[in-house]
Amino acid sequence: MEELPATAIGIKTKDGVVLAAERRLSYGDFVLSKSARKVFKLGRFGIAGAGIVGDIQTLTRIMNVEIKYYEMYNSRKISARAAAKLLSVILYQNKVLPYISELLFGGVDEDGPKLFILDPIGSLIEDSYAAVGSGARVAIGVLEAEYNESLTSEAAKELAIKSMKSAVERDVMSGDGIDILIINKNNIYEDFIKI
């Protein structure tokens, strides 16, 4: 499969999850926008992705509704694993005409921080760090060299920025700033880094 345009990064920390994605929206060698968001809050969770931005936005809207429905119907909060599995099922149900996106899903629940990687047809993998999209090959090298399980959220944010800057230097389909989501047990913080 061809690499999907954009770069998104996820890092699990000792107390949370950091998701980051750059803002360039490109198709082929044409830059359509320099301000396309690819990182979104989903209640207590977050999602970041590479691929068709409209598909990522649509999946975010669907998941917002599905999470609220689950919690209302079951009278309890959905776990990060159950929410990620729900997203996996939605992707798999559309495998004939898939959402063209590689996704990172993260959050903190009673079992601690969780980070999941999903492909366009719903494969679900839990990991400690990940990079998806056209800049992933460069970004993952930085993550592999510098990741450790004792990272704080602030240190993981700095690692995500460093990793993304490396990817942006080498990948023409990525660039124009970094959106960051820091998810802890009690809060979700958003940040934007201009590059």
Curated annotation (Swiss-Prot):
Pfam families per the UniProt record, alphabetical: Proteasome
**PROSITE patterns linked to this entry:** PROTEASOME_BETA_2
Q: State what inhibits or activates this protein.
A: The formation of the proteasomal ATPase PAN-20S proteasome complex, via the docking of the C-termini of PAN into the intersubunit pockets in the alpha-rings, triggers opening of the gate for substrate entry. Interconversion between the open-gate and close-gate conformations leads to a dynamic regulation of the 20S proteasome proteolysis activity.
Keyword tRNA-binding assigned to the entry: answer is: no
Show the GO MF annotations: threonine-type endopeptidase activity
- The record places propeptide residues at 1-6
Question: What Enzyme Commission number(s) does the record list for this chain?
Answer: 3.4.25.1
Q: Where is the active site?
A: T7 (nucleophile)
> Which keywords describe this protein according to UniProt?
Autocatalytic cleavage, Cytoplasm, Hydrolase, Protease, Proteasome, Threonine protease, Zymogen
GO cellular component assignments? cytoplasm; proteasome core complex, beta-subunit complex
Domain of life here? Answer: Archaea
Q: Where in the cell is it found?
A: Cytoplasm
Which reactions does this protein catalyse? Cleavage of peptide bonds with very broad specificity
Biological-process GO terms, alphabetical: proteasomal protein catabolic process
- Could you confirm whether the keyword Hydrolase appears in this record? yes
Subunit composition?
The 20S proteasome core is composed of 14 alpha and 14 beta subunits that assemble into four stacked heptameric rings, resulting in a barrel-shaped structure. The two inner rings, each composed of seven catalytic beta subunits, are sandwiched by two outer rings, each composed of seven alpha subunits. The catalytic chamber with the active sites is on the inside of the barrel. Has a gated structure, the ends of the cylinder being occluded by the N-termini of the alpha-subunits. Is capped at one or both ends by the proteasome regulatory ATPase, PAN.
Name the PANTHER family for this protein: ATP-DEPENDENT PROTEASE SUBUNIT HSLV (PTHR32194:SF0), METALLOPROTEASE TLDD (PTHR32194)
- Name-wise, this protein is Proteasome subunit beta 1
Identify the species of origin: Sulfolobus acidocaldarius (strain ATCC 33909 / DSM 639 / JCM 8929 / NBRC 15157 / NCIMB 11770)
Specify the taxonomic lineage.
Archaea, Thermoproteota, Thermoprotei, Sulfolobales, Sulfolobaceae
